[in-house]
Amino acid sequence: MHDANIRVAIAGAGGRMGRQLIQAALALEGVQLGAALEREGSSLLGSDAGELAGAGKTGVTVQSSLDAVKDDFDVFIDFTRPEGTLNHLAFCRQHGKGMVIGTTGFDEAGKQAIRDAAADIAIVFAANFSVGVNVMLKLLEKAAKVMGDYTDIEIIEAHHRHKVDAPSGTALAMGEAIAHALDKDLKDCAVYSREGHTGERVPGTIGFATVRAGDIVGEHTAMFADIGERLEITHKASSRMTFANGAVRSALWLSGKESGLFDMRDVLDLNSL
């Protein structure tokens, strides 16, 4: 992997997130936009990636074939769908390319494929690339260790109407951070839905509630509720650029790393706190 001018390829270049990833790649010093990809048959194929993102002409045209651009990038940034990301993962593993994965909604087999690939290539895989969200995850660990055994814990998340997975990857990461701090497995204590006569709340569980409406970029709250008081830790995103900037920053951070599985907390060095 090159030590300077890390060349990135953007998957789903014509989507909302893809366009902002292009903008972020063009703006960050030390990063070069090397390739932009769209699905076969897209009307955007052949377009200039910079013009597509409203950033001016770059000379990088949108293509559908990874083979055609395999010599043009060092790190592949993917915020698409699980099935597409896994295809891209296999290609990157075969050709020794780093990856930044922001796709959510993987099943356990998909997550295992990412872990397996990290034996051969360097991957940053995170549910959320926002600096604020990752600071929040660290705060949740601290709060859970102090309050978790004595409070009812609920996670509430809201996103735009087009989001296809629920709960969000970030909400699940919040649950995992809390469960880990309490020496629990989230699979054993998560409650994802309540309907009808549910009975009283089961102590020690972590509840999840999901909202899908309008154009909400992303809102997440963790509630630690006791009798007479509750602590709420909330993050609200108002622009996808916060995720795009974090993803491109992660690609730059991968410079010089040959293999391994990392997350945004590694990029921000939060694990040392």
From Swiss-Prot:
Classification via Gene3D superfamilies: Dihydrodipicolinate Reductase, domain 2, NAD(P)-binding Rossmann-like Domain
Keyword list, A-Z: Amino-acid biosynthesis, Cytoplasm, Diaminopimelate biosynthesis, Lysine biosynthesis, NAD, NADP, Oxidoreductase
Residues that coordinate or bind NADP(+): R39
Location(s) in or outside the cell: Cytoplasm
Keyword match Iron: no
Reaction equations catalysed: (S)-2,3,4,5-tetrahydrodipicolinate + NAD(+) + H2O = (2S,4S)-4-hydroxy-2,3,4,5-tetrahydrodipicolinate + NADH + H(+); (S)-2,3,4,5-tetrahydrodipicolinate + NADP(+) + H2O = (2S,4S)-4-hydroxy-2,3,4,5-tetrahydrodipicolinate + NADPH + H(+)
Residues annotated for NAD(+) binding in this entry: G12, A13, G14, G15, R16, M17, E38, G102, T103, T104, A126, A127, N128, F129
Gene Ontology cellular component list: cytosol
Pathway(s) where this gene product acts: Amino-acid biosynthesis; L-lysine biosynthesis via DAP pathway; (S)-tetrahydrodipicolinate from L-aspartate: step 4/4
Catalytic site positions: H159, K163
An example Gene Ontology molecular-function term: NADP binding
EC top class, as a word: oxidoreductase
Record: residues binding (S)-2,3,4,5-tetrahydrodipicolinate: H160, G169, T170
Main location: cytoplasm
GO biological process terms on file: diaminopimelate biosynthetic process; lysine biosynthetic process via diaminopimelate
EC number in record: 1.17.1.8
Record keyword NAD present: yes
InterPro entries: DapB_C (IPR022663), DapB_N (IPR000846), DapB_N_CS (IPR022664), DHDPR_bac (IPR023940), NAD(P)-bd_dom_sf (IPR036291)
Subunit text: Homotetramer.
Described function: Catalyzes the conversion of 4-hydroxy-tetrahydrodipicolinate (HTPA) to tetrahydrodipicolinate.
Family: Belongs to the DapB family.
NCBIfam families: dapB
Designated name of the protein: 4-hydroxy-tetrahydrodipicolinate reductase
Organism: Escherichia coli O139:H28 (strain E24377A / ETEC)
